[in-house]
């Protein structure tokens, strides 16, 4: 996959759009099929650059993921508001995976209170999201609780191939495999 948290920048710390677009398209032209971004990446500009890179038939070649900035959500309606804003920035009618970003105990409580399941059902029914998911940044016990809270299609964990003990990556990966996620 191609993560879009960090792109080359210009001296004034803006994304070097032409270089970022060249990199994304080069990756796709050479077999990369997964593009990952999120609302806060590059101060909200990453999604805009990706939208430009995925023009001219490139969108149809990839699985596109972006993330709901859970820490900014205050109401149930905010979830759809952020999704619509992100779809506009990405210049696409849908994302393949829309994931709750950086879930932890506090954020999971908030999402449950605001009925994230209804949001996902609505977004999927409207054709804006294909699959729900979450990214996770907390301990293994809560990880199990989040997994049990819904019928998830997708999960991103922090994983370092050189240190499988970091963030309980080995245990989390084994659990995800056992659940076919």
Which residues make up each language-model segment?
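Beta/alpha (TIM)-barrel catalytic core signal, keyed to glycine-rich beta->alpha loops juxtaposed to Asp/Glu
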Residues: 103-181
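Short, acidic/polar
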Residues: 13-27, 74-91, 137-147
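Acidic (Asp/Glu)-rich catalytic clusters
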Residues: 29, 51-61, 84-93, 124, ...
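Active-site groove signature of glycoside hydrolases
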Residues: 87-108
């Amino acid at each position: 996959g191609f993560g879009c948290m960090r792109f080359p920048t210009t001296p004034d710390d803006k994304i070097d759009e032409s270089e970022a677009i060249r990199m994304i398209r080069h990756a796709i032209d050479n077999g990369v099929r997964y593009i990952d971004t999120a609302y806060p990446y590059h101060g909200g500009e990453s999604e805009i650059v990706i939208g430009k890179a995925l023009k001219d038939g490139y969108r149809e070649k990839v699985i596109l993921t972006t993330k709901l900035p859970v820490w900014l959500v205050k109401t149930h309606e905010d979830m759809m508001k952020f999704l619509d804003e992100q779809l506009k920035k990405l210049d696409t009618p849908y994302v393949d995976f829309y994931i709750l970003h950086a879930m932890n105990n506090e954020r999971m409580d908030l999402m449950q209170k605001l009925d994230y399941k209804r949001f996902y059902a609505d977004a999927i029914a409207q054709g804006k999201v294909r699959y729900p998911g979450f990214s996770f940044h907390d301990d293994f016990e809560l990880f199990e609780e989040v997994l049990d809270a819904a019928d998830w299609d997708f999960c991103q964990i922090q994983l370092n191939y050189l240190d499988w003990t970091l963030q309980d990556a080995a245990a989390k990966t084994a659990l995800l495999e056992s659940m076919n996620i």
